[in-house]
Amino acid sequence: MSRLHPHPVALSKRQRSIAELLVLLIPLVPLGCDGSAAPRIGPDSANAAEGVQMGVSSSEARFVRTIIGFSGPESVRYDPDDDVYYVSNMKGAGSVKDDNGFINRIRASNPDSGSVLVQGGKNGVTLHAPKGLAIHGDTLWTADIDVLRGFDKHSGAPLAMIDFAPLGAVQLNDVAIGPDGTIHVTDTGIIMSPKGVIHTGPDRIFVVGPNAQISVAAEGFQLRRPNGITWDPVGKRWIVLSFDQFAGQIMENPQGSTPPKLIRTRDGGGQLDGVEVLRDGAVLFTSWADSSIHMLANGRDKPIIREVAVPADIGVDTKRNYVLIPLSMLGHVQLWSLDGVVRPQK
């Protein structure tokens, strides 16, 4: 069991009401416009309608563009080897095994050129509600409820399936690769149905080692619904975020299977989702509570992008110095430049 000792965060009655409403609405909002398996990707011609103009005026980072046509986009991963973006699409409630999830492959040099790389229910593929993405060699890994699936990142062909159901996995969420090649997977412990979201637990962090052996690195309520996870090559540690709506925790643990320890509890509330570490060690993370992307550096936490509704599992385009933000409830992915905020990521 984790030995982490969180400190509860006091929120106003209004903040608590908003947070609870957001959690309940997630699976009820239609994700996709036309019901097709692969909505057409393209540029957004109505930025003002989603609050982009307000966010631009109050953000330190620079807004570049919005790409539309996704269906519940949950995670964006940049592959510097091929200069492409991968986007996972849940298309519906996040715990329903409906075999209609899909993953887009998009050329970073021309984001309107996206295509469907992996489609549930076709070509021998099973894919329900893909969430976190990670790349290891030529394999694209994604968390899919209680299974970790691996696909060829070029052809989309299924390569591997690691079943966590025998361990009682509830909601596998984010995926990250360690420097030793192990795969770390968070289990947020929530059920996302068309009727709402229920936290059943257990909250866990799994590690997949050689020969697909699964072990538990940390477990317990103290993890507060672990969500985003990433390896920090600068600090030589894992960074883990909590999705608890009232206690926004940022946690760390060194390489190995020791339980995470608390780095910071956010005064502004919880519902932390995606996390990335930049080359200088700065930590970027998303917050549903204040609809922002934050940067944690030198002990200081500051929002650098504002007015982004329900930002999910972000990626970083290291060639262009962009942060890539999936907006699940809108079916959009936004691109923001970090120039002027942090140095280029090459």
Region locations from a protein language model:
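Bacterial signal peptide processing site
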Residues: 33-36
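A short helix->beta-strand "capping" segment at the edge of beta-propeller domains
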Residues: 50-73
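A short beta-strand motif characteristic of beta-propeller blades
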Residues: 62-67, 112-124, 157-165, 213-219, ...
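Beta-rich, blade/repeat-based domains predominating
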Residues: 70-82, 93, 121-139, 166-190, ...
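Short, conserved, GDST-rich strand-edge loop motifs in beta-rich repeat architectures
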Residues: 87-99, 186-201
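Short glycine/acidic-enriched loop and turn motifs that connect beta-strands
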Residues: 91-95, 147, 190-194, 244-248, ...
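A short loop-to-beta-strand structural motif that recurs across blades of beta-propeller domains
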Residues: 99-104, 147-149, 203-206, 249-251, ...
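Short loop/turn segments that connect beta-strands within beta-propeller blades
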Residues: 107-111, 152-157, 208-212, 254-258, ...
